[in-house]
Amino acid sequence: MQIIMIMKRISLLLIFLTLALSASAQVAYNIEKDIPYHPGAGEYAAERCVLDFYYPVGVKDFPTVVWFHGGGLTGGQKDIPAGLKDSGIGIIGVNYRLLPKADVKEIIDDAAAAVAWAFKEVASRGGNPDKIFVAGHSAGGYLTDMIVLDKHWLEAYGIDADRIAGAFPYSAQKITHFNVRKKMGIGPLQAVVDDTAPLFHVRKLPMPMLVLSGDREMEMNGRYEEQAYFWRMMKLVGNENVFLYEFDGYDHVSMPYPAHNVVKRYIKGICEGKLPQR
């Protein structure tokens, strides 16, 4: 009798898993490629300022992540991170202008223009403009920080940065970016904090923020320590929902892999009105 009951429970579990997988498989995704988002900003902007939008089809009010690629502000291409796909989330992969053909403030402006595009356009594809998240890795994390912390960038497009539902900078430079310092003739180990540094714009945020870092012994020079100092300053100005994560065993390049899973948990929690447990 006990064996029969166990077999029934296993059968019910298999049926449940089959139904769950079937429901997941029924969600199709569309991708629109190379959408211009910053018209009128010049010839180089016309070349670089395009985005891809990956989103679930037939789903209403889905959340969207605006994703900025890394590359030291001098390279890289837009992408849709595999670790965020197939999760019921829209993902906008953004190209932006690069050093040295553009200066850093033009690049930050591109990031703001892309986020403004998201606020104005996601609803036409079924997305919820109240569930827009901003994220990026390395240089992309730096751009995430700048447009979330320094509100004037989005204000230029008629958007209040405080409408962003959550910010997830992955291993971002918190001081003035090293390639900006290089252009100024300043070495990689000499710190500068000017108005293009996220640390310069520390403020109390209405939305949650994750400060994400690779292993402190495997990261870029001082990168974990920058995250920790930035996190501490954000706590001191009154942020209760800013969380520091260090991914042991992962370097600067590989840390997005575990970070994506954490980010997906927070997106789900924020959308449901309850932050996940650490």
What do these predicted regions represent?
Residues 102-123, 146:
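Alpha/beta-hydrolase active-site loop
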Residues 228, 235-278:
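C-terminal catalytic histidine-bearing segment of alpha/beta-hydrolase fold enzymes
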Residues 35, 119-183, 194:
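Primarily recognizes the serine-hydrolase "nucleophile elbow" in alpha/beta-hydrolase
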